[in-house]
Amino acid sequence: MSRTSTSVAASAKSQTIERAALILTYFSAEEPRKTLADLARQLDLSQSTAYRYIATLQAAGLLERDEQRGGYRLGPRVIELSFIALNQIEVRKHALDEMDRLRDRLNVMVNLAILVEGDVLHIAHAVPADWPRWYTAVGRRAVAHCTALGKTLLAHRPWDEVRATVERYGWRPYTSRSIQDFDRLAAELETIREQGYSIDSGERNQGTTCLAAPIRDHSGSVVAALSVSSKAERLTDAFREESLPHVRETADRIAFRLGYLGGTGYL
């Protein structure tokens, strides 16, 4: 095979992999099922060409046909890969027991998240026994600057990076309380850095309040955020004042497990 033929074959293979990967990214919590027409349109391909990529993903267990509702959904192999990926996140390994203890102490939902492409990605939850199990889900994403978890993470990133991220992905407000201008965002992130915690009062969901603190790794870098959340009427000012030390101490205990040795209330 000539160099030109080899180059063309490699390019075609690369394009195939890229398009197959793109198909997987088109599925979301809001759109868990896609028709062949949906995927062909998003790929800007004919349905016959799109189907070849879908068939390849089906064969690998990454997509499956939804026989009851029609269309396609993510396949069982994705669940297996997600489990593997979750178990490789170091902060999650060290956080789970601490999150359970915090949940039992305060009787609120406890959340753990990391920053991904301008969003927070939830990687663990500890839910009180009397809460509905469908209320939350690992893998859920939310706009970072609209959540206490996200603002905590953004507060420890360079401002130029934060601004560039928002400019790239947009404000995407959830409620009238969501931050939608750079001056307010910059001021709030500075306050969060100074006080060491963040509050979301109806910025993600009206009627819900969230309180978050940063988690550092052995180098001192903020790698995740921990939060407690509940109905706004439950997280009163008095309850926040009572619960904040426990939230920060739990975050510090997780950081200690990650090898962080300085500047924590726990130490």
Say what each PLM segment does.
Residues 2-93, 100, 253-260:
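N-terminal helix-turn-helix
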Residues 13-17, 36, 71, 75, ...:
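Short, structured helix-loop boundary elements
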Residues 63-65, 112-113, 215:
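A structural signal for short hydrophobic beta-strand segments in well-ordered beta-sheet cores
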Residues 68-169:
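Amphipathic alpha-helical effector-binding/dimerization core
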Residues 101-102, 110, 172-178, 194-202:
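Short helix-to-loop capping/linker segments positioned immediately adjacent to catalytic or ligand/cofactor-binding
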Residues 161-164, 170-173, 248-267:
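Cysteine/selenocysteine-centered motifs that mediate thiol-based redox chemistry or coordinate metal-sulfur cofactors
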Residues 180-250, 266-267:
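Extended hydrophobic
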